[in-house]
Amino acid sequence: GLPTSKKLEILNKKKLVPKRLNKKIKLKKNQLTKKLLNENLTFDKKIYSLFQKLSKKYKIGIATNAIEETLQIAIKKLRIGKFVKFSISTENIKNSKPHPEIYLRSIVSLNSKPKNTLVLEDSHNGRISAKEAGARLMPIKSLEDVTYKNITNFIENKKIELSDTIDSWDDDELNIVIPMAGEGSRFTKAGYTFPKPMIE
């Protein structure tokens, strides 16, 4: 999804939240997120085992719209730091998803190539970001989809078993007409992503 700063910009433009409250809201949101993580996130043997197995064959990176402190809390709580070769948070990039920057930087830092990089994404913006970066995309619906079997089968172009049907805008026969030239500046600034809404 969108980072907090982007969501606040949209609310500011719609005059639903005064701009002067942005800093206070972001601070409070970060405090609550850290509190929830510290209280509820615990070591998960399945997640640990997954990272352990994958790290024996592949380089693992984490790219997130979360802030660095939140990312590090999660890595520490799950005890997966030794399996992660690279991690990047929203504070380390200029352009948030759906811009491909976060994945392009991850690919370069892992000394990989887009075609050799698999991205697991559960958000629409994240999926656009991954595809724009040229990476292979494995869309997921929930944590249940993130299994060693699904990941390795996807890499080998075999059938994977997902917990639910994945919604996708991808369709070779779908044609989208966007009025005016380009993507529509007001549409982009409002925080929308492809496809452009016909009615607001």
Regions found by a protein language model. Name each.
Residues 2-35:
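A metal-dependent, Asp-based hydrolase signature
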Residues 35-62, 68, 72, 145:
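Short, acidic loop-to-helix structural element flanking the phosphoryl-transfer center
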Residues 48, 68, 72-168:
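Asp-based, Mg2+/Mn2+-dependent phosphohydrolase catalytic module
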Residues 57, 114-116, 171-173:
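A general structural motif
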Residues 60-63, 95, 119-120, 199-200:
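Conserved SAM-binding loop
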Residues 62, 119, 139, 176-178:
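Structural beta-sheet core signal
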Residues 169-200:
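N-terminal glycine-rich phosphate-binding loop and ensuing alpha1 helix
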